[in-house]
């Protein structure tokens, strides 16, 4: 049994920093561990243009702790009216690394998203031409589709066609939650990948609903049946390079989670790497952590792997029960739980 593990510095390929005063909590929490992060653009208003991404990037960089080398990888928010010229500007920038497809109404601050993903093929064509990755929140939002089926229906209705029509387009199936999603990524071409969150790896819908509703485990896409969780786990345990770390860390004030209509999102930034390590060790696959956390995402995004390292030590660490974020209490994912691994 190893008492420490040193890996190349990891990256987080999907997170939500939020904005304003919250950045003072979220940016250091990530930057102290991860070398880079794909930053979601679903602010209010959303980050629609390269110019807006540049301004947001500066606000993030202003909160990076002194002496810490961290690079935010910016993303633009696709809408029905995104011009092709904005895709070209993104491709020509050195800090915008992808465009994000949010079906309108699918998740937090997605009301400005795409109303019909099948009707923006001109944008997919431009992204393919200029080699700008497409990041997908893979859910439909039709009222008649059950919330637990939204990912499967999205694949059948939209994603399979997008993949077939644009074979040279890099696509990331963000926060994959179903066996159908895992199988889609496995069977698609090599320009298809998925990010995996700690909550979808470690939990299923029983952890949300059995014994009472647990609002701090509530996220979108929602937790699914155990069989879907096991499909995600298998992909990570076997070290499939199409699946890599993306926390989807997303803070909300406790008052907005513990409410009659609570917000979706799990704030996992501080605990993420120990959580992934704990899971992999439990499945005798700790040797897969470096690929999953440090190599596969960098390779997919065609960025250099980090040469510096981080070290995890076998030292019990209790996840804080509450974190002060801009004067608001935030309950983190796995709050109060003791993990066997901590950052050295």
UniProtKB/Swiss-Prot annotation:
Residue intervals passing through the bilayer: none
GO molecular function: dihydroorotase activity; zinc ion binding
InterPro entries for the chain: Amidohydro-rel, DHOdimr, Dihydroorotase_CS, Metal_Hydrolase
GO biological process: 'de novo' pyrimidine nucleobase biosynthetic process; 'de novo' UMP biosynthetic process
Residues that bind Zn(2+) 2: 100, 137, 175
EC numbers: 3.5.2.3
Active site (catalytic residues): 248
CDD domains referenced in this protein's UniProt entry, alphabetically: DHOase
A cellular component annotation (GO) from this entry: cytosol
Pathway the protein contributes to: Pyrimidine metabolism; UMP biosynthesis via de novo pathway; (S)-dihydroorotate from bicarbonate: step 3/3
Binding site for substrate: 16-18, 42, 137, 220, 252, 264
This protein's record includes keyword Zinc: yes
One Pfam entry name: Amidohydro_1
Entry keywords, A to Z: Hydrolase, Metal-binding, Pyrimidine biosynthesis, Zinc
Catalytic activity: (S)-dihydroorotate + H2O = N-carbamoyl-L-aspartate + H(+)
Modified sites of kind N6-carboxylysine: 100
Keyword Hydrolase assigned: yes
Cofactor: Zn(2+)
Cited function: Catalyzes the reversible cyclization of carbamoyl aspartate to dihydroorotate.
Record-linked HAMAP family: PyrC_classII
Record family assignment: Belongs to the metallo-dependent hydrolases superfamily. DHOase family. Class II DHOase subfamily.
Oligomeric form and interacting partners: Homodimer.
Protein name as catalogued: Dihydroorotase
Organism this protein belongs to: Alcanivorax borkumensis (strain ATCC 700651 / DSM 11573 / NCIMB 13689 / SK2)
């Amino acid at each position: 049994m190893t008492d420490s593990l040193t890996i190349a510095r990891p990256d987080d390929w999907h997170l939500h920093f939020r904005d304003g005063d919250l950045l003072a909590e979220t940016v250091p929490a990530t930057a102290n561990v991860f070398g880079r992060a794909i930053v979601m653009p679903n602010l209010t208003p959303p980050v629609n243009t390269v110019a807006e991404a540049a301004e947001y990037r500066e606000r993030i960089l202003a909160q990076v702790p002194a002496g810490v080398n961290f690079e935010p990888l910016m993303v633009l928010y696709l809408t029905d009216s995104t011009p092709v010229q904005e895709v070209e500007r993104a491709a020509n920038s050195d800090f915008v690394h992808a465009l994000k497809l949010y079906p309108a109404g699918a998740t937090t601050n997605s009301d400005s998203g795409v109303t019909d993903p099948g009707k923006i093929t001109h944008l997919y064509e431009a992204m393919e031409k200029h080699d700008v990755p497409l990041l997908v929140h893979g859910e439909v939002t039709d009222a008649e589709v059950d919330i637990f089926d939204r990912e499967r229906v999205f694949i059948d209705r939209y994603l399979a066609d997008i993949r077939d029509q644009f074979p040279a387009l890099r696509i990331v199936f963000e926060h994959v939650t179903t066996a159908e999603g895992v199988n889609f990524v496995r069977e698609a071409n090599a320009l298809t990948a998925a990010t995996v969150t700690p909550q979808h790896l470690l939990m299923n819908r029983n952890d949300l609903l059995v014994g009472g509703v647990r609002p701090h485990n509530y996220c979108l896409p929602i937790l699914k049946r155990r069989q879907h969780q096991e499909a995600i786990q298998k992909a990570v345990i076997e070290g499939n390079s199409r699946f890599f770390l993306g926390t989807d860390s997303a803070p909300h004030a406790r008052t907005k989670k513990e409410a009659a209509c609570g917000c979706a999102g799990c704030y996992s930034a501080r605990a993420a790497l120990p959580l992934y390590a704990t899971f992999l060790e439990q499945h005798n696959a700790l040797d897969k952590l470096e690929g999953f956390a440090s190599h596969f995402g960098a390779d997919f995004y065609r960025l250099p792997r980090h040469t510096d390292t981080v070290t995890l030590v076998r030292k019990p660490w209790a996840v804080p029960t509450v974190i002060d974020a801009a004067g608001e209490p935030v309950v983190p994912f796995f709050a109060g739980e003791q993990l066997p691994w901590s950052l050295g």
